[in-house]
Every structure is written in structure tokens, then in C-alpha cells.
Amino acid sequence: MLFRSTVDLLPLAQEAAENLRAAAEAKNVSIIVSGENAPVIGVRRLLYEIAYNLCDNAIKYNTDGGSVDVRVGAEGGSACLTVRDTGIGIPPEHQSRIFERFYRVDKSHSKASGGTGLGLSFVKHAVAYHHGTIALKSEVGKGTEIAVRFPQEK
């Protein structure tokens, strides 16, 4: 059974980033979390996995010396978690499919970086479970930004 409670996205994002710090350092990628408290009612484990998967992908598909910027905030009745990287980016023709199970943009890169191809599919379903939305912006050679928004209880 999934237990819902009040979960603040800022310390959750900080925890996910800290747990990925060694992976980021191994790729010479900096990861910074900033923002403000943004509480939501949800399943802590699922919300953590959303933050973790987004940060993990931002590190895996980044460039040497790149960066990952994680921002958390509350705006217009929503809590928002945004992960922006300076990585390889996603070609426009693949952007509509990256949240599908097992879908990989570059299968050769995926073998080198590991993973199952389920991370972003999980993110999509966990965000939907929390009645949230996902927005993607990406440019090849410049990086990717994924923003997830969750309704905040009044």
C-alpha cells in the first residue's frame, strides 16, 4: 500500500543529488540544487524516484565538465521540480517518445551508460499518479530541461 504524506520537494531533491554525487564526480559533472520549500501531498518514495531518475539521466547524458541545475519552488498553487543539464540534448523527432518504456534515443550510448530504459517511463507514471504534469525542453548539443509540477493542497 502506498502511504501519502506531506513531502517537501527541496530536501528530497537535495537527497537525490547527494546520492548521485559520486556518479556526477566520476563524469566531471557538477550538480547543484537550489530553490525554496515546496510541500506536496504524495508518496515519498515515488517522489524521490522522480527526482533521482531525472538527475541520474541529466548526469548520464551530460558532457565532460557539464552541469546539472536542480530547482525547486512553488508557484501558482503548484510545486515544481526542474532539472536542467548541459548535456547532449534530445533530437526533436525523439522528444515525444522518451517517456515510453524501453525507448532509447541512442542505443549505443545506452549500452555504455547502463540502465533499463524504464527511468523516464517511471517518471511519467509517478507524476501522473500525483496528478502532476511534465514539460520537456531540449536542444541537441545544448542540453535538456524537464520540469514536473504537482498540485499543492490548500
Placement of each model-derived feature along the sequence:
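A conserved beta-strand-to-alpha-helix junction within the catalytic ATP-binding
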Residues: S5-E18
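Conserved micro-motifs of the catalytic ATP-binding
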Residues: M1-F3, G35, P39-R45
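Short conserved segment of the HATPase_c
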Residues: I90-R104, K124
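Short conserved segments within the C-terminal catalytic ATPase subdomain
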Residues: A23-V33
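Conserved glycine-rich
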Residues: H131-G132
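Acidic ATP/Mg2+-coordinating residue in the GHKL
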Residues: D85
